[in-house]
């Protein structure tokens, strides 16, 4: 049975990738359908109740800069905000919010239900319809067929998901939700490379059974950060603390004595887990010299008694989980509400994707989120946004868009996945970016909002506010560079009181601000440089741009050198077998990866600079290089 309407874009899955993937084409004016097995779990935080962190906060800001939802929802739901690495340089500072699960889900659902051009339908997708290697629609469990010009698949951990608690296991997409088995079989039939990954979650503890009085408190920042460029502190709900406890030798003994009942250590689980979020049994065995691990007790919400013990993800049997929990300080009498578990699921090799996240094999079919081998809400949201944008551009027969590595962390993420692939759940870190001084949280809107405006992703109110901010930044910089202080100035004594060394030659406001002891607030407290502007976002940009000008210019010069051939396109039908001078190994890798550009080809393991030169020569011979390349 066919549904009466035809859609431009269908998105399968209502998690963090799916919600962004559905909103993007709808904002672009395209008729979009979001298919989910349960509308009540839209935007569900399946694991830890937190958004952001090192690298991850950067992704949230980038999604927000392009009109995405995650930052807005985090502001509405955040019950503890912190700026991580606040004492370090601006490149690695990151925002993190502890979130109320219910408020977060409400914010997501409200945004989806009020988005023009977006329909939501509750039904499990069981098949993707394809004709002549081109997607044509989706069929569901009840036999209803939806026709569409493009499809974005964001199935999370649901594809052939299997939940493990001890040596018992059963099919499931997450606790309480069914796995998507039929769709997994269908995707395997398409000839895409598939493998298994694993992730896990800790048991949830009843707050009423925890002795918080003997535990250390962790409060949020006194000056609360805001995630969205359009948000404000007034969006935040009540702020509450987290608490800290530790594992101990008794905890570790309980774990070591029960490894024969662990699905990971008995070979029942074959999928590889996330390196940077290991289970407690992994931590105890891998770091045997440590007699304690820090555990954060994170509240799941303002109206919930559930507590998330961050740091004890486990798939050990329930009785062992009780032993682990009750062995820790403050948790001696704690009761588990939900057991921890591990989940294995299918993921598809992201090297079979274009950088737009469209599959190379099927036109109009896009993948985003954990199906591509990533871990984390933020990584999923960034991919969902990108896939949704390109699904919309595909429908309109417009040129695809994807960010470069020097343009955003989303660009780093996608390039890493599509070029190198992954054998373990991939997460973003600031260390993965070569040009991280340019990819800061604070300038995500400067980097990406103009592009979002061109693509039709943001409204005019947001665009006007962005332009006002840019005008303030430029006006203030011009003001500071036009006001000079010289050794004979009547204000010299006032300035020398705050300068590390006396002023001996004429200096502009920008020159003074470059001094390590000087800040914008100190500078604008001096009589010649009063008054300060009130917009703190603009102040931050002015200060960073001036203080780090030399470093920023150096990185931009490096980028320009690199870009000479970075974006040189390699045609999809380029025949490497006819390129003489390439080794068989290099030729095989290029045939396997089918890189879309010289830059992508250069990052494939084993592809030498000499091989790149040979390819460039052949592209030039065949007239495939543009003038100047």
Swiss-Prot record:
Needed co-factor(s): FAD
InterPro entries: FAD/NAD-bd_sf, GIDA_C_N, MnmG, MnmG-rel, MnmG-rel_CS, MnmG_C, MnmG_C_subdom, MnmG_C_subdom_sf
SUPFAM superfamilies per record: FAD/NAD(P)-binding domain
Cross-referenced Pfam families: GIDA, GIDA_C_1st, SAM_GIDA_C
Gene3D superfamilies in the record: FAD/NAD(P)-binding domain, GidA associated domain, C-terminal subdomain, tRNA uridine 5-carboxymethylaminomethyl modification enzyme MnmG/GidA
Keyword NAD: yes
Principal location class: cytoplasm
Assembly behavior: Homodimer. Heterotetramer of two MnmE and two MnmG subunits.
The protein's name in its UniProt record: tRNA uridine 5-carboxymethylaminomethyl modification enzyme MnmG
Protein's organism: Haemophilus influenzae (strain 86-028NP)
Gene: mnmG
């Amino acid at each position: 049975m066919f549904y009466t309407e035809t859609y431009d874009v269908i998105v399968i899955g209502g998690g963090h990738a799916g919600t962004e993937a559905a909103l993007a084409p709808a904002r672009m004016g395209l008729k979009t359908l979001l298919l989910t097995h349960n509308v009540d779990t839209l935007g569900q935080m399946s694991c830890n109740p937190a958004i952001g962190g090192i690298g991850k906060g950067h992704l949230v800001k980038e999604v927000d800069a392009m009109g995405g939802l995650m930052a807005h929802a985090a502001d509405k739901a955040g019950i503890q905000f912190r700026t991580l690495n606040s004492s370090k340089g601006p490149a690695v500072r990151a925002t993190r919010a502890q979130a109320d699960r219910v408020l977060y889900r409400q914010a997501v659902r409200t945004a989806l239900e009020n988005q023009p051009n977006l329909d939501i339908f509750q039904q499990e997708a069981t098949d993707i319809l394809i004709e002549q290697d081109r997607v044509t629609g989706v069929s569901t469990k009840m036999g209803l067929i939806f026709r569409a010009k493009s499809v974005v698949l964001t199935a999370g951990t649901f594809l052939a998901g299997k939940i493990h608690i001890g040596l018992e296991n059963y099919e499931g997409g997450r606790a309480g939700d069914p796995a998507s088995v039929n769709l997994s079989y269908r995707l395997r039939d398409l000839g895409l490379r598939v493998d298994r990954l694993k992730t896990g979650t800790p048991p949830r503890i009843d707050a009423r059974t925890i002795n918080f009085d003997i535990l250390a408190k962790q409060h949020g920042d006194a000056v609360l950060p805001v995630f969205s460029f359009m948000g404000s502190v007034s969006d935040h709900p009540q702020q509450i603390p987290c608490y800290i406890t530790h594992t101990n030798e008794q905890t570790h003994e309980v774990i070591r004595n029960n490894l024969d009942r662990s699905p990971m250590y008995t070979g029942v689980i074959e999928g590889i887990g996330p390196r940077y979020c290991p289970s407690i049994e992994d931590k105890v065995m891998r770091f045997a010299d440590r007699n304690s691990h820090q555990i954060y007790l994170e509240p799941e919400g303002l109206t919930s008694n559930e507590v998330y013990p961050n740091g004890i993800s486990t798939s050990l049997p329930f009785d062992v989980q009780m032993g682990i929990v009750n062995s820790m300080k403050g948790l001696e009498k704690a009761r588990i509400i939900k057991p921890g578990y591990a989940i294995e699921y299918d993921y598809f090799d992201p090297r079979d994707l274009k950088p737009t996240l469209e599959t190379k094999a099927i036109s109009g079919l896009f993948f985003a989120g954990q199906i591509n081998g990533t871990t984390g809400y933020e990584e999923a949201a960034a991919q969902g946004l990108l896939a949704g944008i390109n699904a919309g551009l595909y429908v309109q027969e417009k040129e695809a868009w994807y960010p470069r590595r020097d343009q955003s962390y989303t660009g780093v993420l996608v390039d890493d996945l599509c070029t190198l692939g992954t054998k373990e759940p991939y997460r973003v870190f600031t260390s993965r970016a070569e040009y991280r001084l340019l990819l800061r949280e604070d300038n995500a809107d400067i980097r990406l909002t103009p592009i979002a405006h061109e693509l039709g992703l943001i409204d005019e109110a947001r665009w006007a506010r962005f332009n006002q901010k840019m005008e303030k930044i430029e006006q203030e910089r011009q003001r500071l560079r036009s006001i000079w202080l010289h050794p004979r100035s009547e204000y010299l004594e006032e300035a020398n009181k705050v300068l590390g060394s006396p002023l001996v030659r004429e200096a502009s406001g920008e020159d003074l601000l470059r001094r390590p002891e000087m800040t914008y607030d100190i500078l604008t407290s001096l009589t010649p440089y009063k008054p300060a502007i009130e917009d703190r976002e603009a102040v931050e940009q002015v200060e960073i741009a001036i203080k780090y000008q030399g470093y920023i210019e150096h990185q931009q010069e490096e980028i320009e050198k690199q870009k000479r051939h970075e974006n040189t396109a390699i045609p999809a039908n380029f025949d490497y077998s006819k390129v003489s001078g390439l080794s068989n190994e290099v030729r095989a890798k290029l045939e396997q990866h089918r890189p879309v550009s010289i830059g992508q080809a250069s990052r494939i393991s084993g592809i030498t600079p000499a091989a790149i030169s040979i390819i460039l020569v052949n592209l030039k011979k065949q007239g495939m290089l543009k003038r100047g390349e």
